[in-house]
């Protein structure tokens, strides 16, 4: 017996409601006594009512953007593209990124045109820079209402929801705020990886390469680093001062720390990295639970929890990304199925 399995998306109208359906077609051929018989079976799954409009949620850091297309019944389709940051990209560059990376992933979704709200949370989305992102999205999603917020608001919504507390981002960059359940009421300026971004991957990478090339770590570690990355001090200077996205470059080097936490010198470097953040930033906020978003917080959470406990802070959620929390937070913004 031979089998052939195909699938496709199609639209179906049932009782005046429009659905996006995934069709799974199983076609088989069975031969017996010189005759062949063909049969087919069609299975419909993932029925999504698209009579009502949907929303698009974006969580964008400096390295990647996580997109979620949410239907009225709560079903989501998720996509990933490069990071979008209006401090580092023009509106045209942002538009090109969305056109070239997001839209091809959504090409099979014939219902993408029914998006009527977009909530974009992004690094660098200050009140002055947010219009750059809005203009780029408006040029593509012409019928959608677009709201652009900072990644800090996204982190607070994602990790705290409607509860009050301290929300922190520790990813490629770093930031923090006090959230009253509805809005940010206090924010210690992040200032970027050169002047601030305490606790971030970029600053951890900066500290690592500085200590390595200034002979503050062992020869064993320096040799291991060189064998893995094969870079010189001149390479670091070129990538940090002459090439785009130096923060991403430095953050990528911080991975060396996570791979060598069994080395006491690296373990101490990482502890001191978070301890500096805890002592310099967190005391400026009310004494409430501290929640974290970001890959650095997530992958170093054992050290982070110890540092916060040593400094007398209560740790809340530590999530790699805010999207699950944002999906829950924005359910109210999707029009209900009629």
Predicted regions and their residues:
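Glycine-rich phosphate-binding loop plus the immediately following alpha-helix
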Residues: 184-230
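Short beta-strand-loop/turn "lid" adjacent to the catalytic site in phosphate-handling enzymes
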Residues: 87, 106-147, 159-160, 239-243
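Adenine-nucleotide phosphate-binding core of ATP-dependent small-molecule kinases
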Residues: 88, 230-286
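Glycine-rich phosphate-binding/hydrolytic loop that grips phosphoryl groups
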Residues: 157-163, 297, 302, 306, ...
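Conserved phosphate-binding catalytic cores of ATP/NTP-utilizing and phosphoryl-transfer enzymes
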Residues: 144-168
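Phosphate/pyrophosphate-binding loops at sites that engage ATP/ADP/AMP, CoA/4′-phosphopantetheine
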Residues: 100-116, 280-288
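Glycine-rich phosphate-binding loops at beta-strand->alpha-helix junctions
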Residues: 121-128, 267, 281-306
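Short glycine-rich, Thr/Ser-proximal phosphate-binding strand/loop in the N-terminal lobe
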Residues: 55-94, 184-185, 190
